[in-house]
């Protein structure tokens, strides 16, 4: 199904539409959060997450949602799930009964679950959201990739060794800096003490001995 199918047919004249928008305060753009790419193991269940932020609470009588599938960027979109006051699963032949709604519109979550993922499920999944009085349609786009085998686990030994080495090096540097700072502080204190002693000795020599003057 093409995106044009999303747009509602006008139910009143352009004059009435203009008057309606003039009375409604301008809404802020809706933000939709989805993963750009989702890697899923063949035969497993995949949750296609889609959440949104809106300035307005969700009114189920006005809220609307469309989930569509595309085989490629330039391919036509097929709608497989929508929300019109309730969830409507269109049960495309491609998915049959493998699609379930797992979100909660009242909590700004419209995610879906795809059971038993197959290689032919690979493609683009679009999440379209309208939450009046927001005038902007939210759109999230997920590229689903199906893996035929689990990716090899990354060896974390090297990372641990590098991290430990860096941490040890930083600890040594900090220790050296502290030692240098302590040595400098002790030297400064010693110089200050020596200067004070010299100053006191000079004062004593300047005053002289009173008995020497009497002679």
Swiss-Prot record:
Residues 187-215 are annotated as: Disordered. The modification Phosphoserine is found at residue 192. Keywords: Atrial fibrillation, Brugada syndrome, Cell membrane, Cell projection, Disease variant, Disulfide bond, Glycoprotein, Immunoglobulin domain, Ion transport, Membrane, Phosphoprotein, Signal, Sodium, Sodium transport, Transmembrane, Transmembrane helix, Transport. SUPFAM superfamilies: Immunoglobulin. The chain crosses the membrane at residues 158-179. Regulatory subunit of multiple voltage-gated sodium (Nav) channels directly mediating the depolarization of excitable membranes. Navs, also called VGSCs (voltage-gated sodium channels) or VDSCs (voltage-dependent sodium channels), operate by switching between closed and open conformations depending on the voltage difference across the membrane. In the open conformation they allow Na(+) ions to selectively pass through the pore, along their electrochemical gradient. This is Sodium channel regulatory subunit beta-2. The lineage of its organism: Eukaryota, Metazoa, Chordata, Craniata, Vertebrata.
């Amino acid at each position: 199904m093409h995106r044009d199918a999303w747009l509602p047919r006008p139910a009143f004249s352009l004059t009435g539409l203009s008057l309606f928008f003039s009375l409604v305060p301008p809404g802020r753009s809706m933000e939709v959060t989805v993963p750009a790419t989702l890697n899923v193991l063949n035969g497993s269940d995949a949750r296609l997450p889609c959440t949104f932020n809106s300035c307005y609470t969700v009114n189920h009588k006005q809220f609307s949602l469309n989930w569509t599938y595309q085989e490629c960027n330039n391919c036509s979109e097929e709608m497989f799930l929508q929300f019109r006051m309730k969830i409507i699963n269109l049960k495309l032949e491609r998915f049959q009964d493998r699609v379930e709604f797992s979100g909660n519109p009242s909590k700004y979550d419209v995610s879906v679950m795809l059971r038993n993922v197959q290689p032919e499920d690979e493609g683009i999944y679009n999440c379209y959201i309208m939450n009046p009085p927001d005038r902007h349609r939210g759109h999230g786009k997920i590229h689903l990739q199906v893996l035929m085998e689990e990716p090899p686990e990354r060896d974390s030994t090297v990372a641990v060794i590098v991290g430990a080495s860096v941490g040890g090096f930083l600890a040594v540097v900090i220790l050296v800096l502290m030692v240098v700072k302590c040595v400098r502080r002790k030297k400064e204190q010693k110089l200050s003490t020596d200067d004070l002693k010299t100053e006191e000795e000079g004062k004593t020599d300047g005053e002289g001995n009173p008995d020497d003057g009497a002679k």
